[in-house]
């Protein structure tokens, strides 16, 4: 129930659909804690990310949809990611044979970091499928936190290798794509 999830928080109902809406880090922490408590699903970040189509990101999403290549869309996302939020920074670079999308926390999110990281990675994955529906899924995921207890239930659904306790949270895929 949206009303119950937002009760007492400085968040307007329906703001998730507004590309201009902003949420402070403190409000995000309170909301993420409540979301997990209400759903009983600590992996809710994966579902949240999957529910955000490109169009939910306003002009940035539409610009990505009009990009000629996935590389162009990623370049736009990195360049303008800060217009969507300031809690994390998105960085893209090539490392050997890998193209890397890296999330850098701009302030410590502690126990709430996994929810944000997982929702962003899920969102990026499904937006990539919107842009290139026929692409084979190759790559790996790296997370800068220990493996959560709930992850053993998710692992079979994720078609790429997954690593925890890494230096950074990254999505990696073959650079030639």
Q: What kind of feature is each model-predicted range?
A:
Residues 67-177:
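Alpha-helical bundle regulatory/interaction domains
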Residues 1-102, 137, 148:
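N-terminal low-complexity or simple alpha-helical regulatory segments
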């Amino acid at each position: 129930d949206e009303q119950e999830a937002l009760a007492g928080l400085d968040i307007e109902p329906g703001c998730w659909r507004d590309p201009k809406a902003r949420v402070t880090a403190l409000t995000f922490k309170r909301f993420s804690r409540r979301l997990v408590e209400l759903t009983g699903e600590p992996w809710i970040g994966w579902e949240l990310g999957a529910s955000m189509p490109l169009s939910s990101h306003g002009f940035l999403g539409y610009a990505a949809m009009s990009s000629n290549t996935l590389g162009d869309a990623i370049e736009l996302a990195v360049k303008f990611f800060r217009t969507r939020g300031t809690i994390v920074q998105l960085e893209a670079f090539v490392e050997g044979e890998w193209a890397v999308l890296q999330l850098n926390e701009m302030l410590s999110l502690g126990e709430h970091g996994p929810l944000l990281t997982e929702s962003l990675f899920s969102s990026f994955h499904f937006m990539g499928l919107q842009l290139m529906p026929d692409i084979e899924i190759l790559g790996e995921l790296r997370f800068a936190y220990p493996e959560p207890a709930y992850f053993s239930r998710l692992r079979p659904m994720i078609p790429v290798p997954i690593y925890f306790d890494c230096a950074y949270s990254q999505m990696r895929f073959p650079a030639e794509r």
